[in-house]
């Protein structure tokens, strides 16, 4: 009886594996690139947060609702980080790399994406404080993205 049950479980597993949908190599490459960059950027942001002097911020709870919402949050965080903030250039380059990977995929496989509006940084009064809030938000958002990378498949 036990061997029949084991055989049934094995055959059921083989059937599931054999009937699985084929994996899109472009999608897997984009997801892999995004996750790798997100991990590297998360570590850099964690270092910035740990060494910062000043108030600690709790991030807003962003939700992942597909590729366009992910790109919108990343764009918003980029706009909130002041160019005067330490390591802003490195952070923005990494975010740009993330967005380029997602944008390339989106251009090929999704419809037209809504445009995002850049905010003018010259009118900011508390740019360093706002930058720290954006860094904290971005770090938590990247962790959420790494844990929910399937959202990258949704246009």
Swiss-Prot record:
Organism, as annotated: Oryzias latipes
Upper lineage: Eukaryota, Metazoa, Chordata, Craniata, Vertebrata
Signal peptide extent: 1-20
GO cellular component: extracellular region
Expression across tissues: Expressed at moderate levels in the liver. Expressed at low levels in skin, gill, muscle, intestine and eye tissue.
Entry keywords, A to Z: Disulfide bond, Obesity, Secreted, Signal
Similarity section: Belongs to the leptin family.
Protein name, per record: Leptin-A
Domain of life from the UniProt record: Eukaryota
InterPro entries: 4_helix_cytokine-like_core (IPR009079)
Subcellular location: Secreted
Role played: May function as part of a signaling pathway that acts to regulate the size of the body fat depot.
Keyword Signal: yes
Disulfides per UniProt: 110-155
């Amino acid at each position: 009886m036990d061997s029949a049950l084991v055989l049934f479980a094995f055959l059921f597993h083989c059937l599931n594996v054999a009937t699985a949908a084929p994996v899109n190599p472009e999608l897997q490459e984009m997801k892999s690139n995004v996750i790798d960059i997100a991990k590297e950027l998360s570590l850099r942001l964690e270092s910035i947060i740990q060494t910062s002097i000043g108030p600690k911020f709790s991030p807003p709870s962003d939700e992942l609702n597909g590729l366009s919402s992910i790109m919108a949050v990343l764009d918003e965080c980029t706009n909130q980080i002041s160019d005067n903030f330490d390591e802003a250039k490195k952070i923005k380059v990494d975010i740009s790399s993330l967005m380029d990977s997602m944008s390339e995929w989106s251009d090929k496989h999704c419809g037209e994406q809504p445009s995002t509006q850049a905010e003018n940084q010259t009118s900011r009064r508390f740019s360093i404080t706002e930058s720290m809030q954006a860094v904290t938000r971005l770090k938590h958002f990247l962790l959420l993205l790494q844990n929910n990378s399937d959202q990258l498949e949704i246009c």
